[in-house]
A protein has these predicted regions:
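Intrinsically disordered, low-complexity segments enriched in proline/serine/threonine
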Residues: 9, 17-18, 28-29, 133, ...
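Bacterial N-terminal signal peptides
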Residues: 19-20, 26-41, 46
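N-terminal secretory signal peptides that target proteins for export/translocation
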Residues: 1-25
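Feature marking well-ordered beta-strand scaffolds used for ligand recognition
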Residues: 48-615, 629
Length: 684
């Protein structure tokens, strides 16, 4: 039996919740928070999930492989449409071509913007069963992650091949005035013809970015840039420094970059600060690779070593250095000694001696004076929640909480490390801001990490409660169906599904498909729906699967790495009622950037009250006879109008106040009473 290791918490200067601008919870959310606390204390959340078993055997196991014709399995989730990528964004002759990976999603009006390592696609999804390509731009520069704000589109560019002119020929010089690494800003007023208005260069490029809105600044938006590439040469971008901070106080290490975008003049966007949010963190130990992977890598390495190949260890795994890389290194050694012609045996011996230390420096980061290994030097992704003045930073070896009340100067206020986490990847807050979920992208997203022997706490989600100065670990969640060695699978991007009274999330797991799960009780998360396909290839791993699965105005939209765009609908079940789905569909937003998390607010509606009734029934939170009477009273009031409806609802709310004291789920009955009272107030 293995023992779970407890995450280690570091906290610095966390502001009280009352002290954060905009942090006070509206009455309805305060009631929701009380529900969450009640669930954790009483176990009512587990009762909500009781008696609704997932299908057995799991239909996701053993699915037929295929590119566009793989077998599919689903439970409580219906595939509405799959739209293949247009020709310019796929290689029809090479499945899994890394140059044409579909990446993240952003939403505006009837459009979803889908990033692709070769550019952007803008889909009209007003008819979810038949999406239409409304606009596109071929512009290589992986990952091309996207965000939108009004008529502006923001795109992350990190690849060395990215060009200012969006050319497809790449950039081959080590230093070039043509290279673009940073954040592109496009005007998409005419979605059919996206137009670049600014290229904001950054020292490490932009692997991901976070669009941050500020309640106190409506003239600007801010972009938090997370760059994971090596620091650029100052000969290419002035001011860039890859030295240790003790060698150069302006080092790019341990920082993010903040871009201010004046909305009236986006062409004037520029980097305004470089907060060192990672400074002072110690190196965080993580788990080794799976024993099966270590043994398999050693066998491959032994065979390659016997043939004269160069072998190094990367994160504990033997890796064979590619001939292109070693060839360049050997040529450099010939030039270093002033020689010409082919490398000699002495050159090869020198490379063997120097290669492992070189790789260690590349992957382990800088070593500080005294041989101290610091924590991570960059973040992978940040999720901002402006309404509560906080952001969650997923920063390789740590999960962070940031104070973003001054959006140009985010400040770390808490950090947590977990030896079960390999690579902190992304974050999601609960709607009330009192819980936070971090994902672990163990294996980097291109490895199979959901096999039957992979530990359930590795490559999973970690769920925490968040109370002022304290992050408290609760549990892990991992998509439960074992996948094959030919399917890249690990926790990736997802968003909340706006079901009132519950914390539900839809999440992409690459070739593990889409998993929808309830984490209202963070100590006991539970899958309630899924969709999955078989592997791309039954004989080898070809990268594919759901990069992101996001709820948007009634549907779950998924960016499928190799197969295009999926749109899915939740189906009613014992774990999620039609009333709950309909209540979620009441929430409509004009734009959505999941990493700029916005507070979910439900309108006063009878279906919201009925959703709470369904939850009370599922969890045995109110006596059955009393619940029947409440439903009857709601139905009667809905048929009424004017003063009669108002009086009926006010009377019912008062009765529910009295019911709460003896109910098994007091907090949810109070929430229902609040909703009924809101309905009375909305009646004219």
């Amino acid at each position: 039996m293995t023992t779970l290791r407890t995450p280690v918490l570091q906290t610095t200067g966390f502001p009280s919740r009352a002290g954060r601008a905009g942090a006070a919870l509206p009455p309805r959310l305060a009631a929701l928070a009380a529900v969450a606390l009640s669930l954790a204390a009483t176990g009512v959340g587990r009762a909500q999930m009781a008696g609704a078993a997932a299908p057995s055997p799991d239909p996701r196991v053993g699915l037929r492989a295929g590119w566009m014709n793989a077998a599919e399995a689903s439970w409580n989730l219906k595939l509405v449409s799959t739209t293949p990528p247009p020709a310019q964004f796929m290689n029809g002759n090479e499945p899994g071509d890394f140059n044409f990976i579909n990446s993240d999603l952003a939403f505006t009006g009837k459009y979803v913007v889908q990033g692709n390592f070769s550019g952007i696609q803008i889909w009209d999804i007003s008819q979810p069963a038949h999406p239409v390509l409304a606009g596109s731009l071929v512009c290589p520069g992986a990952q091309n992650d996207v965000s939108v704000y009004r008529n502006l589109l923001f795109v992350s560019v990190e690849a060395n091949s990215g060009r200012l002119d969006c050319g497809t020929q790449g950039v081959h010089d080590s230093v070039s005035a043509d290279r673009m690494r940073g954040v592109r800003i496009l005007d998409i007023t005419d979605v059919a013809h996206p137009r670049v208005v600014a290229n904001v260069q950054t020292c490490r490029g932009s692997h991901t970015h976070t669009l941050v809105t500020s309640p106190s600044d409506t003239a600007d938006v801010f972009i938090y840039v997370s760059g994971s590439a090596p620091v650029r040469s100052p000969s290419e971008l002035a001011g860039c420094s890859g030295l240790r901070p003790d060698q150069d106080p302006k080092s790019e290490q341990f920082r993010i970059e903040v871009i201010r975008v004046p909305l009236a003049h986006p062409e004037q966007a520029q980097v305004v600060t470089k907060p060192a949010i990672l400074s002072g963190l110690a190196h965080a130990e993580t788990h080794p690779e799976a024993p099966e992977d270590i043994a398999a890598a050693a066998r491959v390495a032994d065979s390659a070593r016997a043939k004269g190949a160069f072998v190094v260890k990367v994160f504990g795994l033997d890796q064979v250095a590619g001939p292109q890389f070693t060839g360049r290194m050997l040529d450099s050694m010939v030039k270093l000694r002033g020689g010409t012609g082919a490398p000699t045996a002495a050159d090869s011996a020198m490379l063997r001696d120097s290669l492992q230390p070189m790789v260690d420096r590349m992957f382990n980061g800088p070593t500080l004076p005294g041989g101290v290994r610091p924590g991570p030097v960059q973040c992978h992704d940040i999720t901002a929640y402006p309404a509560i003045g906080l952001a969650g930073g997923a920063c390789a070896g740590y999960g962070l909480v940031l104070d973003i009340r001054d959006p140009a100067n985010p400040r770390r206020v808490a950090a947590v490390a977990d030896p079960n986490f390999s690579y902190w990847h992304s974050a999601t807050f609960s709607n009330d801001g009192r819980k936070i979920l971090f994902t672990d992208e163990w294996g980097g997203g291109l490895q199979p990490r959901c096999r039957s022997f992979d530990r359930k706490e590795w490559g999973a989600d970690a769920l925490f409660t968040l109370a002022d100065t304290t992050l408290t670990f609760q549990s892990y969640y991992k998509m439960p169906a074992p996948q094959t060695a030919n399917e890249n699978c690990v926790a990736h991007n997802g968003s909340l599904v706006p079901v009132p009274g519950r914390d539900i999330m839809a999440q992409g797991w690459y070739q593990g498909g889409i998993s929808v799960f309830d984490w209202t009780d963070p100590a006991h998360p539970r899958e309630i729906a899924f969709f999955d396909r078989g592997p791309m290839d039954s004989t080898k791993l070809e990268g594919a699967g759901s990069w992101s699965a996001y709820w948007y105005n009634g549907h779950i939209v998924s960016s499928e790495i190799a197969r295009g765009l999926d749109i899915l609908d939740l189906q009613p079940s014992a774990l999620l009622s039609q009333n709950e789905i309909d209540a979620a569909r009441l929430v409509h937003v004009d734009q959505l950037n999941v990493q700029d998390q916005q507070r979910i607010v439900w309108p006063a509606a009878f279906v919201v009250a009925r959703a709470y009734c369904d939850q009370l029934e599922r969890g045995n939170g109110l006596a059955a006879a009393r619940l029947r009477a409440v439903r009857s009273a709601l139905a009667s009031a809905e048929r009424q109008s004017g003063r009669r409806r108002q009086d009926s609802l006010t009377r019912l709310a008062t009765q529910l106040d009295g019911d709460a004291s003896s109910a098994a789920d007091q907090a949810r009955v109070k929430l229902l009473a609040w909703e009924v009272r809101e309905l009375a107030g909305a009646t004219h």
